[in-house]
């Protein structure tokens, strides 16, 4: 399955000057919501991702996503894996588990995002779950921006990666684009970074 083509066909691979939720600036932005607005395509992508996870023979009892960007991807992945789905959300800028969601002690959970950049949001989600007694067994995403190391990829983890090295990250593709710290972003010389989606917008 050509993941890059899926994003291009959905007009979800945007070019410009963007502020990512990780804080980095980039000339490309992956707008997964545009891909996931097609339920059939969302199902196909989730089935592809589930296949990778099932081949790893992991015992997963639940999928959890940080709101809002990860919710559709996480729900479809949970459906493909045949497990329940929950999500965390920000309250006063702090990640929390709400809406009556509960986790059991030692419940094995995969944290799923639509896109993994540094993995910061995924780790905030994981921390909430671990504090409630859950066991994080893996991370998942439709796409990995190449900072974190994913299973079945030759790319190594880069500076800024937040995901733990002892847990696998499953994703359908690596999208490696230039990313810059705001203090050294060459794009800022000619334009102002915009934030087309995700945290805070």
Swiss-Prot record:
Its EC number is 2.4.2.10. Orotate binds at residues 117, 145. GO terms for biological process: 'de novo' UMP biosynthetic process; pyrimidine nucleobase biosynthetic process; UMP biosynthetic process. Its cofactor is Mg(2+). SUPFAM superfamilies: PRTase-like. GO terms for molecular function: magnesium ion binding; orotate phosphoribosyltransferase activity. InterPro entries: OPRT (IPR023031), Orotate_PRibTrfase_bac (IPR006273), PRibTrfase_dom (IPR000836), PRTase-like (IPR029057). 5-phospho-alpha-D-ribose 1-diphosphate binds at residues 113-121. Pfam families: Pribosyltran (PF00156). The keyword Lipoprotein does not apply. It comes from the Bacteria. NCBIfam families: pyrE_Therm. Homodimer. Belongs to the purine/pyrimidine phosphoribosyltransferase family. PyrE subfamily. Catalyzes the transfer of a ribosyl phosphate group from 5-phosphoribose 1-diphosphate to orotate, leading to the formation of orotidine monophosphate (OMP). This is Orotate phosphoribosyltransferase. It comes from Helicobacter pylori (strain ATCC 700392 / 26695).
